[in-house]
C-alpha cells in the first residue's frame, strides 16, 4: 500500500515538473518571438493624442504597422513631468530599434539624444537634421496647401480669406505660402490674412482667433492648421456661418456645415512605409532624407463639401494640380 502511495506521489511530482518545464518553454518561445520584432518608439508633440490631426495620424501609422508587420511600439507624450529630451533618452536607454519624433518642435531634443547615442537610429517627421543617425520624412505640404488655396479662392465671396496656423515654424510657413499662392492663382484680387496662435493645444484660443478674423477682418474662408487649437477654430467658423479648410486628416466631422475640404498630409502612410523600409533594409534607411508631395500621393485634398465647382472651375483646378504635381509650376518658398 505504501509502495503504491510512493508511486502515485512520484507521478504527481513528475507531472508537476513536466508542466513547469512546458510553461517555461512556452514563455521562452514567446520571449523569443517578441525579441525578433522591431521595437519602435515615438515621441509625440506636447498636444499628444486626441488632436484629431498630426499626432493621431502618426500614431495610426504605427498601429497599422503593428497590426500587419513584425513590430511592437510604445509612445511618449511630452508634458510638464516628461520633456521630449527625457522621452528620447528613455527610448535610447531601452535600446529601441527606431525612435521617431514629430515636427520641428522636438528637433533640438532629438539631436541631443542622437549625439549621445550615435548608434541609435532616429526618424524625424516634418524637419531635417545633419546628424548621421537622424533620418527624416518631409512633405511638400505647400503643394497640398496650394490646392487648398485654389478652393478657398473660388469659394470666397468677400475676396478675403485667412490662414490660421499653430506655431510659426518652417513647416507651417510653407503651408501659408503655398496656400496664398493657390488663392491668388484663381483669385488675384483676394487678400490673404495669416495669423499664428503660438500654440497647438488651446481650443479656446483657436475660437477667439477665428472669431476675430471673421468679425474684424471680414474673412469668409479660413484654412486652419493648428492641431487642437484648430479644433476650436473650426467650431467657431461654423458657428459664424463661414467656411473652413481642415488639415492633416479629414476634419469634416468636426464642422460639417463649414468644411469645404481638408488638406491631407498622409503622415500615417509615410510612417507605415518608412517602418517597413527600415525592417526590409535590416534596420537602416536607404535614404537619409525622404521628401514626398503630390506626385507621391503624400499630400492632397479630401473630397469637397458645401461647395460645387462649375465645369470651368473644375477644369482650372485639374490643370493647376497637374502643373504642380509635374513640377511645371513651382511654389516659391521664402526662408
Where are these regions (language model features)?
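Bacterial N-terminal signal peptides that target proteins for export
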Residues: 2-13
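C-terminal motif of bacterial Sec signal peptides marking the signal peptidase cleavage site
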Residues: 20-24
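A residue-level marker of the well-folded mature domains of exported/periplasmic proteins
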Residues: 25-335
Amino acid at each position: 500500500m505504501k509502495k503504491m502511495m510512493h508511486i502515485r506521489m512520484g507521478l504527481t511530482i513528475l507531472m508537476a515538473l513536466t508542466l513547469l518545464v512546458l510553461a517555461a518553454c512556452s514563455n521562452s518561445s514567446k520571449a523569443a518571438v517578441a525579441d525578433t520584432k522591431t521595437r519602435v518608439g515615438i515621441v509625440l508633440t506636447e498636444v499628444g493624442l486626441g488632436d484629431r490631426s498630426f499626432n493621431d495620424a502618426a500614431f495610426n501609422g504605427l498601429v497599422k504597422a503593428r497590426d500587419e508587420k513584425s513590430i511592437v511600439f510604445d509612445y511618449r507624450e511630452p508634458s510638464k513631468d516628461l520633456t521630449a529630451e527625457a522621452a528620447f533618452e528613455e527610448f535610447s536607454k531601452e535600446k529601441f530599434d527606431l525612435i521617431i519624433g514629430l515636427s520641428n518642435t522636438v528637433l533640438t531634443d532629438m539631436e541631443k539624444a542622437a549625439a549621445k547615442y550615435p548608434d541609435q537610429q532616429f526618424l524625424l517627421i516634418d524637419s531635417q537634421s545633419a546628424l548621421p543617425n537622424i533620418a527624416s520624412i518631409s512633405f511638400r505640404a505647400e503643394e497640398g496647401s496650394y490646392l487648398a488655396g485654389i478652393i478657398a479662392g473660388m469659394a470666397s465671396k468677400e475676396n478675403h480669406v485667412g490662414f490660421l496656423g499653430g506655431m510659426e515654424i518652417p513647416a507651417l510657413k510653407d503651408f501659408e505660402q503655398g496656400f496664398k499662392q493657390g488663392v491668388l492663382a484663381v483669385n488675384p484680387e483676394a487678400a490673404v490674412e495669416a495669423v499664428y496662435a503660438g500654440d497647438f493645444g488651446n481650443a479656446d484660443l483657436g475660437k477667439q482667433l477665428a472669431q476675430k478674423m471673421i468679425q474684424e477682418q471680414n474673412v469668409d474662408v479660413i484654412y486652419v492648421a493648428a492641431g487642437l487649437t484648430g479644433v476650436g477654430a473650426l467650431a467657431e467658423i461654423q458657428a459664424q456661418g463661414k467656411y473652413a479648410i481642415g488639415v492633416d486628416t479629414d476634419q469634416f466631422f468636426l464642422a460639417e456645415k463649414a468644411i469645404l475640404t481638408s488638406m491631407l498630409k498622409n503622415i500615417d502612410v509615410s510612417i507605415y512605409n518608412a517602418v517597413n523600409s527600415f525592417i526590409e533594409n535590416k534596420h537602416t534607411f536607404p535614404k537619409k532624407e525622404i521628401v514626398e508631395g503630390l506626385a507621391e500621393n503624400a499630400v492632397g485634398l479630401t473630397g469637397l463639401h458645401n461647395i460645387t465647382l462649375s465645369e470651368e472651375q473644375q477644369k482650372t483646378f485639374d490643370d493647376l494640380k497637374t502643373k504642380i504635381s509635374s513640377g511645371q509650376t513651382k511654389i516659391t518658398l521664402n526662408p
